[in-house]
Amino acid sequence: MAIKRSSKATSSQAASIKQIVKRCSSLRKMKNVNGCYYNQEDDLPQDVPKGHFPVYVGPNRSRYIVPISWLHHSEFQTLLRLAEEEFGFDHDMGLTIPCDEVFFRSLISMFR
């Protein structure tokens, strides 16, 4: 699967990313979701540092904590669009990235 790299995100891409982040941040408040404990007051997993968010990758749903800055990478934006197409964002499964875990690790190694 080839992912095209662009130097700048268009304003429509930025708007889409903001919408995705907004949807993800409005997940229901629950005590324990997918083995992750949430603080009922601020709706954030207690083990996720500020400026990061969890994603679940592959058929085994391996959990990764990724920095918000990755939202600016066109490759990561492509994965988010694939996630929206395959799963939508109105479910209790957390943000699930529909790709092979080996591919995801390879991709994120370029971001570091």
From Swiss-Prot:
InterPro entries: SAUR_fam. The keyword Zinc does not apply. GO terms for cellular component: plasma membrane. Confined to the veins and petioles of rosette leaves and cauline leaves, and specifically expressed at the abaxial side of inflorescence branche; relocates to both the adaxial (Ad) and abaxial (Ab) sides of the branch in reduced red:far-red (R:FR) light, during shade. Also present in flowers. It is a peripheral membrane protein. Keywords: Cell membrane, Developmental protein, Growth regulation, Membrane. Induction: Induced by auxin (e.g. 2,4D). Up-regulated by brassinosteroids (e.g. brassinolide). Highly induced by a synergistic combination of auxin (e.g. IAA) and brassinolide. Accumulates in response to reduced red:far-red (R:FR) light, during shade; this light response can be attenuated by AGL8/FUL in the stem. Repressed by AGL8/FUL in stems and inflorescence branches. Accumulates in reduced red/far-red light ration (R:FR) conditions mimicking shaded conditions. It comes from the Eukaryota. The keyword Cell inner membrane does not apply. It is found in: Cell membrane. Belongs to the ARG7 family. Provide a mechanistic link between auxin and plasma membrane H(+)-ATPases (PM H(+)-ATPases, e.g. AHA1 and AHA2), and triggers PM H(+)-ATPases activity by promoting phosphorylation of their C-terminal autoinhibitory domain as a result of PP2C-D subfamily of type 2C phosphatases inhibition, thus leading to the acidification of the apoplast and the facilitation of solutes and water uptake to drive cell expansion. Triggers plant growth probably by promoting cell elongation. Regulates branch angles and bending. This is Protein SMALL AUXIN UP-REGULATED RNA 10. It comes from Arabidopsis thaliana. The gene is SAUR10.
